[in-house]
Amino acid sequence: MIIDLPSTTTSKVNKKLVELRETGGAVALGRVLTLAIITDDGAQAEEAIAAANEASREHPCRVVLIAKGARRAAARLDAQIRIGGDAGASEVIMLRLYGPLADEGASCLVPLLLPDAPVVAWWPYETPKVPAEDPIGRLAHRRITDAKSERNPVKALEHRAAVYADGDTDLAWTRLTSWRALLATALDLPPHEKVESATVTGRADSPSTTLLAAWLASALGVPVTRVRAQDGQGIVSVVLQRRSGQIVLERPNGQFATLTQPGQPDRRLTLHRRSIRDCLIEELRRLDPDEIYSQTLQALPKVEGGSAGASTSRRGTGSRTRTKTATAGKSAGRAGGKTTARTAAAAPAATSPVAGTGTTRSRRTAEPKPSRRGSTAAARSRSRAKNGEDTAGEQG
């Protein structure tokens, strides 16, 4: 049931709620909290109400949506009450504020609060600079924001850390619950070795990727690198480096993940991207300060930025390791060749030169012997037979 109350007051809205309770049997005695949603009028308001209705099936509450309308219009309050099937397990009160009233959301909210019930404020889109100092934020026990909706999500997280107050939380943090649980479970399995470093890969505009990297830096106390991914959605992969090998949790498609651990078969896991409904339900379960979230925000400066497009999957890391090994081998070979040349220069002239070093040969031997090519060819054959041993060392 939807009841429209155009050009009304909060007093008339309260009277209408009492009337509906008496005639229709809609009661507010079972409501556990008041959820205040602050957003602009339009499609965004309906999306927020839909998510709140779904969340109310687990947390019956009174939803008061404060929709800010045109500020140049005349001062006016339009209200709408939704109960029954249109409100899930809650009762929804939508307040559309126009003109000067658009900035008086707290004054309109107070008369509609449930008595002796906690208040949760949710800004699904535009967020005040300091939520705890906002007029509605002062009324709330919990203040929910969403850095994902900001123009610069990562910078928004840094601002959240600077103005954090007990009761603040962000849905970018709530989206990490499944990732944190899987990583913690993987570390609980043997071998119980210390993590040496970690790498988190995700899209550049993913605040959850940055928060996950900060959480690992805070919880493990190890260097953590945040790498930007060109493909994928949100968080793509996490690599934990230990002495025995890597723990890799990779989700390339945003739905299913693969957990790889040394000495164990790969495991395919369901790791869907969490909806607003799921995140809101989780946040409404607790009204106390989130200390882990606070510590994670303070650990943001510890995260090292990564190069764009780099990959942290197990295969990618292995290829980089092989490349580094090959490069080191070439460098060692060159160094060995130079040492052999210097040693041969100090030796008698009869000592055979290193294959392919014509300059060294001319310095060591003024008059080359006729059999030099044969000796060099034989040295090359012996070098191949011994799988890459140094020719000069073999002849010496």
Predicted regions and their residues:
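An N-terminal, globular interaction/scaffold subdomain
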Residues: M1-A121
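A generic structural motif
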Residues: V63-R71, W122-P124, A147-K148, P223-G234
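Internal, hydrophobic cores of structured domains that mediate oligomerization or house catalytic pockets
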Residues: L95-A184
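Long, compositionally biased intrinsically disordered terminal regions
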Residues: L220, G232-G234, R243-G316, R322
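Short N-terminal or domain-adjacent regulatory/targeting segments
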Residues: M1-G30, D170-D188, R285-S311
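Extended, compositionally simple fibrous regions characteristic of intermediate-filament-like scaffolds
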Residues: V27-A28, D86, E150, A165-L176, ...
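ATP/pyrophosphate-binding catalytic subdomain of soluble kinases
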Residues: A172-V227, S237
